[in-house]
């Protein structure tokens, strides 16, 4: 009798466990908080605002393109993620996917691209962003790099369907969907929040924290460039770029690099020598379009609204639209300039002139930076 009761108890416990597993998995599948289940229904007020996608790019953007099957991939940092609308990519380049990820390193971009081809995505064109901070040994906000591949697919499935984090994500999705005013990452990888800045509080106090480790004052009138710029740039990043070039060449992929606008706040605090060395090293890459000296992007004074910048780090939708237009039109671009060893001296000279003009427009910022460097704060 006791054995029979024990058997029934274990059977009931097993049935409840299975039922609980099915219930949790079913609820998570219906809510679909990560947006990975393409056939899941869209229910207003329940699963329209998938906020979990916003913070899960390194997972989600491995798998999204498998079902979307884009012809063009835009790879880059949060500057791409927030501003580059794949819907603006047309003609032979459509459809496109925004593979922008916060603080994306060059090696992560390489792994993403190789993983996409491994998964059979029919990529024909790649627009690859080159941002100065991607080449530093350390970058605030950079996460541990996670290789792309099929080896972790089962683990990823469990993490997004049957786990505590998946349940929490489902609850957050329902809560945000009820509010219906949350900006979320779309299925094509685009999270549209890079609006023009209104000029108020444009440069946050935190700029000093990252700036003081890159430059030191040499006198009251001059901020010196880093003494050893090469030590600040990761050689591995440049080697990874060479691998990307060879990979795309081997698979007949049209690869186009682009250097998006760099706000003078960054340029001034990093120093000209470092910037020159970085430009020199990327100028040997094929098909590099530089937007550093584009006249339209000089709308960066600290004292008035910014059409082409959403903050001191990110560009706006308007800037991204112009860059997309040029990337598709290459080599007949209207706004950017081809960067190669022949054009390098001219681009550097123009950029230095622009930076000097900006410093004259913003003397308070320049003097404040010098004072901060002298005090070591």
Language-model features and meaning:
Residues 213-304:
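Flexible, glycine-rich surface segments
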Residues 269-377:
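C-terminal regions of proteins
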Residues 47-74:
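Short extracytoplasmic
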Residues 31-56:
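Alpha-helical transmembrane signal-anchor/signal-peptide segments
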Residues 68-161:
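Membrane-embedded segments
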Residues 1-9:
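N-terminal Lys/Arg-rich, disordered targeting/topogenic segments
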Residues 130, 139, 143-251, 335, ...:
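Secreted/periplasmic serine-hydrolase-like ester/acetyl group-modifying domain
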Residues 12-32:
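Hydrophobic membrane-insertion alpha-helices, especially the h-region
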């Amino acid at each position: 009798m006791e054995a029979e009761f024990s058997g029934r108890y274990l059977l009931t416990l097993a049935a409840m466990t299975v039922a609980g597993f099915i219930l949790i998995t079913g609820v998570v599948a219906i809510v679909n908080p990560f947006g990975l289940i393409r056939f899941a229904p869209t229910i207003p007020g329940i699963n329209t605002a998938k906020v979990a996608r916003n913070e899960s790019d390194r997972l989600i953007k491995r798998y999204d393109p498998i079902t979307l099957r884009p012809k063009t991939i835009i790879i880059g940092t949060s500057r791409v993620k927030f501003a580059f609308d794949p819907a603006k990519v047309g003609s032979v380049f459509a459809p496109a996917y925004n593979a922008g990820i916060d603080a994306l390193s060059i090696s992560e971009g390489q792994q993403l691209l190789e993983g996409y081809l491994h998964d059979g995505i029919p990529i024909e064109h790649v627009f690859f962003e080159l941002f100065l901070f991607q080449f530093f040994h350390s970058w605030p906000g950079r996460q541990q790099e996670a290789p792309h591949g099929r080896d972790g697919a089962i683990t990823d499935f469990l993490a997004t369907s049957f786990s505590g984090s998946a349940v929490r994500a489902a609850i957050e999705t329902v809560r945000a969907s009820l509010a219906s005013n949350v900006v979320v990452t779309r299925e094509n990888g685009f999270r549209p929040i890079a609006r023009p800045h209104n000029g108020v509080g444009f440069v946050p106090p935190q700029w000093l924290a990252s700036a003081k480790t890159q430059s030191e004052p040499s006198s009251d009138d001059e901020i010196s460039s880093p003494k050893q710029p090469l030590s600040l740039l990761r050689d591995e990043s440049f080697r990874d770029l060479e691998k990307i070039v060879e990979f795309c060449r081997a698979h007949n992929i049209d690869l186009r690099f682009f250097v998006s606008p760099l706000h003078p706040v960054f340029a001034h605090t990093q120093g000209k020598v470092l910037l020159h060395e970085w430009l020199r090293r990327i100028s040997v890459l094929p098909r590099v379009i530089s937007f550093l000296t584009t006249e339209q992007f000089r709308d960066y004074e600290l004292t008035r609204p910014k059409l082409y910048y959403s903050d001191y780090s990110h560009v706006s939708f308007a800037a991204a639209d112009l860059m997309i237009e040029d990337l598709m039109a290459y080599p007949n671009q209207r706004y950017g300039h081809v960067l190669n060893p022949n054009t390098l001296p001219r681009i550097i000279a123009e950029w230095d002139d622009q930076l000097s003009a900006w410093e004259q427009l913003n003397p308070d910022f320049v003097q404040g930076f010098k004072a901060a460097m002298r005090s070591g704060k």
